[in-house]
Amino acid sequence: MKELGRLITAMVTPFKTDGTVDYAQAQKLALGLLDSGSDGLVVVGTTGESPTVTWEEEHALFAAVKSAVGNRGKVIAGTGANSTQEALENTLKAEKIGVDACLLVVPYYNKPTQEGLYLHFKTIAEATKLPCILYNVPSRTITHMNPETVIRLSQIPNIVGIKEASGKLDDIAQIINNVRPDFTVWSGNDSDTLPMLAMGSYGVISVASHLVGNQIKDMITSFVSGNTEHAAAIHRHLTPLIRSLFVVSNPIPIKYALNYLGFEVGGLRLPMTEADEKTAALIRESLRGYTIDLPIK
């Protein structure tokens, strides 16, 4: 579903000093991301600490960000769960709030079969009018959704695309070759954006775009317009920064970077912890080599 955009940022969830969600700062961040290259935003995905944000907080964040963004960009609600019924109910609530699409992660911990994955996503998609984006991230979910399952799911009309974060480029090529023509594939790893574009993907659902959104957008636009040398140069330039943002579990590094740069997003909820000094020093050193696109003040 190409109207959702080529560059989508998976937003962090800002917290106040008392640990409650800072909805006003989430709105400010959303607008800043749109001002620095993002076409759309994922609200309460992995980067948004979905495991430790309550359903009520999630729904309030969906509403707050959609209210702030209006028609300036697309809002994609992270509504996935490892319970089909919970994911379905959360998706229906997001639809009622008025978001533009939903992101549905592969169920984690309970390790469903490929048939279970198919039925999970089919059940949710058939219950909602929202465009549904699949999310394959086996490094977090353990279960890998096979290309054959994705291809099968792509025949369901409102399953419109996939965030592919497996890093398995052979599988991704098989998906791109066999899904229906309007099914959209986004990279789910910043480091794979350009390689996947070369294979026929559409864009990226990014973490690094919190900081360098305009530069990532330039890379994508350059590649699509045929200026592959410029796109490759940007990719090489951004690689050290991207590496530093994943030196420990996301979103620990990106939250540290934003706070360090002066855009306050608060801490993390346990069991996630803040960056230790070794990690913080590495991120600070990495940031020195880059122009930051996000409006900080």
Curated annotation (Swiss-Prot):
Pathway: Amino-acid biosynthesis; L-lysine biosynthesis via DAP pathway; (S)-tetrahydrodipicolinate from L-aspartate: step 3/4. It catalyses: L-aspartate 4-semialdehyde + pyruvate = (2S,4S)-4-hydroxy-2,3,4,5-tetrahydrodipicolinate + H2O + H(+). Gene3D superfamilies: Aldolase class I. The active site is at residues 135, 163. InterPro entries: Aldolase_TIM, DapA, DapA-like, Schiff_base-form_aldolases_AS, Schiff_base-form_aldolases_CS. GO terms for biological process: diaminopimelate biosynthetic process; lysine biosynthetic process via diaminopimelate. Its EC number is 4.3.3.7. Keywords: Amino-acid biosynthesis, Cytoplasm, Diaminopimelate biosynthesis, Lyase, Lysine biosynthesis, Schiff base. It is found in: Cytoplasm. It holds the Pfam family DHDPS. One of its GO terms (cellular component) is cytosol. Pyruvate binds at residues 47, 205. It is an enzyme of class 4 (lyase). One of its GO terms (molecular function) is 4-hydroxy-tetrahydrodipicolinate synthase activity. Catalyzes the condensation of (S)-aspartate-beta-semialdehyde [(S)-ASA] and pyruvate to 4-hydroxy-tetrahydrodipicolinate (HTPA). Belongs to the DapA family. Homotetramer; dimer of dimers. HAMAP family: DapA. PANTHER family: 4-HYDROXY-2-OXOGLUTARATE ALDOLASE, MITOCHONDRIAL, DIHYDRODIPICOLINATE SYNTHASE. This is 4-hydroxy-tetrahydrodipicolinate synthase. It comes from Dehalococcoides mccartyi (strain CBDB1). The gene is dapA.
